[in-house]
């Protein structure tokens, strides 16, 4: 029976969803997979073992998810929701014909915003469906579910991409902002940096991705920042206006310094696929201290974590990394290798039972 993998937001090759599914398919090593994904994913390819079901539309997603779970829970086979949300627990409780047995349904939570109301909800679901397997990216995520009474909770660090040893010799080429243009990812600070570089007549190459989020939208602040960026006269600036293919996206990292001045409150315990992609390609990272990103780079000397990133501190940190790029690049590869050894182990152990 194929493994039933559900990733409703997977629409194309952008974002973390694609890399996550690729990593899981690689880890399951030839086992058949039914992939239930967004309606725009039909033309994607994950290899001969994966059957794509392009099902989900954004506005209908909760209802479609409920119907899908209702159907799958009445068949044999295991179900993995690779990017789980609180709502998925409620839908499972509604869809299940009875108590879900152990090792049947796996929900992978990347982060949890802990509130009193959410904790009460988790406790209620744990009493009703204690055998749902909860996987979490960090200790603090899994601790929430353990405290709420779920009996099968495991740490599964966010899977790392394969490292790219052929890029180890790349010298510094440019600064890079990769991923969707978003305020919580410090896009405005990166625009401030470009303005500063232009004002000081510097010639440091910088590439900035200005594509929207999964839903093709920008908020007002980001639109204003893009307008500012387009108005800057800085010849070494290159803009990525279209969502890159996987190959194009990967090619951005070797020789780059990845700028991630992410919001500390939002990313204190929230995984960044861009960080993992950067490290896999030997790309050092500049990020915000006290974030998940910082915890990935600091033990390995894979970049610099800033207490309060702004344009001036980004510029100074970039100069430090450029001056000793080979050492920081090696640290990035070391961080990626350490992360890769942990990928999917907690899930695979249960699937083999």
Question: Residue ranges of each PLM-predicted region?
Answer:
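Conserved donor-binding/catalytic core segment of Leloir-type glycosyltransferases
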Residues: 6, 166-185, 190-198, 206-208
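Short beta-strand->alpha-helix junction loop in the catalytic core
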Residues: 111-112, 140-141, 155-165, 212-214
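Nucleotide-activated donor-dependent transferases that construct or modify glycoconjugates
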Residues: 1-14, 177-178, 261
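A short, active-site helix/loop in glycosyltransferases that binds the activated sugar's phosphate group
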Residues: 114-153, 295
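Nucleotide-activated donor-binding/catalytic signature segment of Leloir-type glycosyltransferases, i.e.
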Residues: 129, 220-250, 257
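Nucleotide-sugar-dependent
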Residues: 260-276, 288-290, 294-295
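A charged, aromatic-enriched C-terminal amphipathic alpha-helix characteristic of glycosyltransferases
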Residues: 15-16, 308-316, 322-352
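A short, glycine/small-residue-rich beta-strand->loop->alpha-helix junction that serves as a flexible
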Residues: 5-22, 183-185
């Amino acid at each position: 029976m194929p493994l039933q993998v559900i990733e409703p937001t997977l629409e194309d090759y952008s974002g973390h969803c694609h890399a996550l599914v690729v990593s899981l398919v690689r880890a399951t090593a030839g086992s058949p997979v039914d992939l239930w994904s967004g309606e725009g994913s039909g033309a994607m390819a994950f290899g001969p073992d994966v059957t794509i079901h392009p099902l989900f539309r954004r506005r209908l997603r909760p209802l479609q998810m409920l119907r899908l779970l209702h159907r799958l829970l009445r068949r044999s086979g295991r179900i993995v929701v690779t990017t789980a949300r609180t709502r998925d627990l409620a839908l499972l409780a509604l869809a299940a014909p009875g108590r879900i047995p152990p090792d049947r349904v796996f929900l992978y939570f990347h982060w949890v915003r802990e509130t009193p109301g959410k904790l009460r909800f988790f406790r209620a679901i744990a009493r009703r469906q204690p055998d749902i397997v909860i996987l979490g990216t960090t200790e603090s995520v899994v601790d929430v579910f353990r405290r709420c009474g779920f009996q099968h909770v495991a740490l599964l660090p966010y899977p790392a991409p394969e490292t790219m040893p052929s890029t180890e010799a790349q010298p510094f080429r440019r600064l890079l902002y990769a991923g969707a243009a978003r305020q919580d990812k410090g896009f405005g600070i990166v625009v401030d940096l470009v303005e500063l570089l232009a004002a000081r007549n510097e010639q440091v190459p910088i590439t900035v991705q200005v594509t929207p989020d999964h839903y093709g939208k920008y908020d007002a602040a980001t639109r204003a920042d893009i307008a500012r960026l387009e108005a800057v006269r800085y010849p070494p600036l290159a803009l990525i206006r279209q969502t890159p293919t996987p190959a194009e996206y990967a090619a951005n990292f070797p020789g780059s310094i990845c700028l991630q001045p992410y919001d500390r409150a939002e990313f204190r315990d929230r995984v960044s696929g861009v960080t993992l992609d950067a490290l896999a390609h030997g790309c050092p990272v500049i990020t915000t201290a006290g974030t998940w990103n910082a915890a990935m780079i600091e033990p390995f000397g894979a970049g610099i974590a800033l207490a309060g990133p702004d344009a001036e501190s980004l510029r100074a940190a970039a100069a430090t990394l450029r001056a000793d790029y080979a050492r920081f690049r090696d640290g990035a590869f070391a961080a990626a290798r350490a992360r890769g050894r942990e990928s999917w182990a907690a899930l695979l152990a249960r699937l083999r039972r």
